[in-house]
Amino acid sequence: MTSKKTTPMMKQWHQCKEKAGESLLLFRMGDFYEAFYDDAIVLSQNLDITLTQRQGIPMSGIPVSTINGYIDRLVSKGFKVAVAEQLDEAQDNKGKSEPLSRELQRFITPGTLLSSSLLPEKANNYIVSINRVGALFGLACLDFSTGSFLLQEYDNMKDLVDEICRLAPTEILSCDKFYKKHADIIEQIQQHLKLTLSTYADWAFEHQFATQKLSLHFHVSSLDGFGLKGLVPAINSAGALLSYLQDKLLLPVEHISIPKTQGNQKHLLIDTASQVNLELLTPIHDPQGKSSLLHVMERTSTPMGGRLLRNTLVNPFYDQKEILLRQDAVEFLLDRSELRKNLKSLLSQVRDLERLTTKITTSLAGPKDIGMLRDSLNASIRVCEVLSPLPLPKFFQGRFTLPIGLTSLSELLSRALLGELPLRISEGNIFCDNHHPDLQRLRYTKEHSKEWLWQYQETIRQQTGVKKLKVCYSQALGYYIEVSSDFAPLLPKEFIRRQSRLHAERFTTEKLQEFQDDMLNISDKLQTLETQLFKDLCAQILQQREEILSLSQVIADIDYILSLSDLAAEYNYCRPIVDTSDSLSISGGIHPVAQTLLDKGTFIPNDIKMHSTRTRMILITGPNMAGKSTYIRQIALLVIMAQMGSFIPAKSAHIGMIDKIFTRIGAGDNLSKGMSTFMVEMAETANILHNATDRSLVILDEVGRGTSTYDGLAIAQSVVEYLLFTEGKKAKTLFATHYKELTDLENHCPHVENFHASVKENGGQPVFLYEILKGHSQKSFGIHVAKLAGFPLCVISRAQQILRQLEGPEATSKQPQEKELQLTLF
């Protein structure tokens, strides 16, 4: 609240704070950005900055020179930051009673980073906007750092949540009405992601406003030409997001691309639970570790290629044509090791073309950024020149003919810019001397002023014949030419008299005045000239913006294929047959992550052979630690790799495309929703039963173990039967279980086959062979595993005694009655 005693400067602060709202306001005051009141306390607590007071008002400050690092720290903690800039310089305001002009100029939020150490180089940084119209959810997804804009719609909450979790945004935008009505959606998302929730006005999500906002931005009268016809919820989300960025956060939006929809593209769907369970992006128990599939496959050299690999890993293809195109391209490079080496070297010189273009579009680029663009364009063009003469596979054909404007731009940047460039324009030394005649003259004048004066003095001595003529300098006159009074009449008419002395006359010339002007203002002139030249160069770059972004996509695709071919070459992967058949046959398959973590040749390969008309359900029994879980995960990972267009670690493989992968592996309590481990297990299994199809792959590990023996067995068998006999749900299923009773199903159903994780006994001790063989397991060796885990020997001994009782002659059934089991414990 302002008061009568509030200073004019603090009135400015209150006006800015009102606009900043919930954001933490950094208010420029000379060489510091200051925070006041509660903002000052928050700043002090989170950045370890001294908290002081001015007239009883809490305040803390950050030096202007270090502002970006502090903003990054605040944003990483989930804060939104508003920055009020000083519009006048202090010297310009000297003698005036009113304060310097200040206004709120920008906001920084987790989802709107443009230039920050927080931006992950090889991952997108998304902000998403969601709303609902009728039964449909609309999702708009924007990577503000690249301008990539995606729209999608969903008819159920689960698919929406899965997609948001796949995208892993850092910020979500919606209106109060949506948040209140769909708190469950936000809760589900927050279980998997750390993100910031942002709220915007309800009216911004109205269709008329959203349509108008998008149409104005993209300069069209209709959005139908973008393939958005009928996508009302998605358009509403997109229009609100654009307005939020431009109108509320005051951010530049010129770089935001025309929104794309998934359209007819088909992808293998991997739900959130499966992404986590299969450790596609992040290891479950070691988030910084090396046991994710992404870590194994990551061989890319460019940020764009890295982002493409990451996105494709969680969104593989369900389109044979797209898969085969990439397989052919991988094979093409796989057979050419020298070409791969050459391309790798060139790609390592390519920086982030997408984000560099965004920085230029939004006027945030500095000279070093333009230098990186120059080097990246040169290397990218060289990549195209290397590949274009070759007999290319279809995936690459027609993609390396570069527009004349792009090659001309590359040549211009190489001619215009110096080799080493500064971070800021104000540091100067950006352009080559010959880029502009005034630049060369000013620099030469500055660097050779004494030499120039001496040469000029000698020149006019020779021209006039006055050998004692001198070029001098004084504070009052500046530079002047002095001759004795006797020789003054000999000087040409263009010499301009400045001063008469007792025995001497002082003159100047236009050339000397020009030199003086240059010397007096040379630094300012140089900075002004280079600033203007820099702006002109950025404008020329932006004329080729779309061509640069197209080249960026080409480089990303090459980098992606090269990464897959390097991986295949390093581990001797095979090319799988991927088609529309119902086959899932892999010979000598190896877990791609385990292969890299273990010594070479120590991982035991295993096979699988499934078909919808023959075996489509495999029951796997065997002791813990024998490799059951590794095996079933392995099959899912190999399918994912194959449908990315990658080769896979196996001797051979024939994979009929899978439309969805579901996993029910492990569990933990979900305390935030009051769900026990067993409830989480049942919820995930229910999702599988509702959403699996005949072309899905289902991975089940120990379903039913979280309850009583009979309950668990009943649930497990019912799930198996449902997936075996329900039309439209006959998915290929790998079921690891300790329920030996389930293995009897093989005798009654031709589509079920038993396998087991093999174990050899040596002196009464099990030796795990890690082979998956036909037939069911005879023993579980659970007590041995307990012993390895460090159980007290007395507990192990008692367990062995109880086991002998249960397995003795008095046990007349395969499964003991629960009452009998209880009696043996006392």
UniProtKB/Swiss-Prot annotation:
- The entry's ATP-binding residues are 622-629
Q: What's an example of a GO molecular-function annotation for this chain?
A: ATP-dependent DNA damage sensor activity
Keywords assigned: ATP-binding, DNA damage, DNA repair, DNA-binding, Nucleotide-binding
- Give disulfide pairs as residue numbers: none
Q: Which GO terms describe its cellular component?
A: cytosol
Keyword presence, ATP-binding: yes
Task: Supply one GO BP term.
Answer: mismatch repair
Q: Which Pfam families match?
A: MutS_I, MutS_II, MutS_III, MutS_IV, MutS_V
Taxonomically, the superkingdom here is Bacteria
The record's section on PANTHER family has:
DNA MISMATCH REPAIR PROTEIN MSH1, MITOCHONDRIAL, DNA MISMATCH REPAIR PROTEIN MUTS FAMILY MEMBER
Q: According to its UniProt entry, what is the function of this protein?
A: This protein is involved in the repair of mismatches in DNA. It is possible that it carries out the mismatch recognition step. This protein has a weak ATPase activity.
Report the family membership: Belongs to the DNA mismatch repair MutS family.
Task: Report what the protein is called.
Answer: DNA mismatch repair protein MutS
Q: Which species is this record about?
A: Chlamydia abortus (strain DSM 27085 / S26/3)
High-level lineage: Bacteria, Pseudomonadati, Chlamydiota, Chlamydiia, Chlamydiales
